[in-house]
Amino acid sequence: MTKQELDKLMLRLQRGDESAFEQIYNDTKRGLFAFIMSICRNYQTAEDMMQTAYIRLRTTISNYRAGSNAYAWLYTIAKNATINELNRSKRERATESFEDDAKYGTYSIDEELSPVTCAMNKVLGDEEREIVTLHAISGFKHREIAEMTGRPVGSVIWAYNNALAKLKKELQKEDEYEN
């Protein structure tokens, strides 16, 4: 879906067209989920934050301005919701006892992730992982990522290339280890 098509759907949603929301959801859910996963690295949290992002989209659609970057707007909502949730969870977990963690455990899907995703989680920082996910998985252009993140295009390209080099090195190291 192009930015212009998404912009039109956002405007339809502003006017109360419920079918526009369904189309927005169906056309953006895969990329948005991958983006959220790159931030929180937990499947259940990503599902929850995706729901939160779409709820906030609906409740704040009146703030959307025609012609602005709808993808950047939606991804910013998702990013802010996810970061807020992670910060809230950190505060809560700081007050929980070690026994609770040992008793109930925590869920991690690292074992179920692809080797590339595991390598991303292992060697990339949050910003690098975000850029790689937005470009390689969600299909955004470097210019669009720069708009979304508020970084210069050159910095986005440099971070992307640097992240790819780290991933390549890590995957080669893992491949050598297996052979």
Predicted segment positions?
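N-terminal module of bacterial RNA polymerase sigma factors
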Residues: 1-31, 122, 147-149, 169, ...
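Structural recognition of an alpha-helix C-terminal capping motif at a helix-to-coil junction
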Residues: 34, 48-55, 68-80, 158
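Short, charged helix-capping/linker segments at alpha-helix termini
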Residues: 14-23, 33-52, 153, 176-179
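Internal acidic/polar
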Residues: 3, 84, 91-121, 141
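Sigma70-family region 2
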Residues: 14-15, 41, 52-69, 88-89
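DNA-recognition helix of helix-turn-helix
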Residues: 83, 137, 143, 147-178
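A short pre-motif secondary-structure segment
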Residues: 131-135
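Arg/Lys-rich amphipathic alpha helix in sigma70-family domain 2
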Residues: 59-66, 76-96
